[in-house]
Amino acid sequence: MAPVCLFAPLLLLLLGGFPVAPGESIRETEVIDPQDLLEGRYFSGALPDDEDAGGLEQDSDFELSGSGDLDDTEEPRTFPEVISPLVPLDNHIPENAQPGIRVPSEPKELEENEVIPKRVPSDVGDDDVSNKVSMSSTSQGSNIFERTEVLAALIVGGVVGILFAVFLILLLVYRMKKKDEGSYDLGKKPIYKKAPTNEFYA
């Protein structure tokens, strides 16, 4: 209990008494105007500091005394209201939006614009057989059992299935014979012996 009482005021003093970071040390992100960089005001990395930022163009807000009283010497500015015509905001696309692009409708124009791929003569491709890939389903007969791979797989699968069935039947017969012989002894003696619980009185 004593260590907790000692650490509680110290913890409160550390967390509550001291601010984590003083306000003066926190800097805001500076915004650099790219136009100033293009005009050549800053050379070889001499970018403005926090104090220099805004020194070129002072707003009228900086000219006040700070007492809270505003100078009423400026005339209020009034802007004429411009009424824009109402434009409907829909997604309708007019038919003649792009007059340069049109679909040809005459058969002559269609024939002129048609692209016909070049055909390779059939006698050129007969000599080079290395590019042709034989499809396994079309290269041989349509009957699946005529293929040697399928027949070999069926024979091996059948043999494995028959062997599995024979071993399963043999296991069942063996268990049934073992049960009939009475090899299962229901009156087994326990492996451990319980210690006597005799009480001795002194």
From Swiss-Prot:
The chain crosses the membrane at residues 150-174. It is a single-pass type I membrane protein. GO terms for cellular component: cell surface; costamere; extracellular region; focal adhesion; plasma membrane. Residues 1-23 form the signal peptide. PROSITE patterns: SYNDECAN. Residues 42-76, 89-138 are annotated as: Disordered. GO terms for biological process: cell adhesion; cell migration; cell-cell signaling; inner ear receptor cell stereocilium organization; negative regulation of T cell proliferation; neural tube closure; positive regulation of exosomal secretion; positive regulation of extracellular exosome assembly. This is Syndecan-4. The gene is Sdc4.
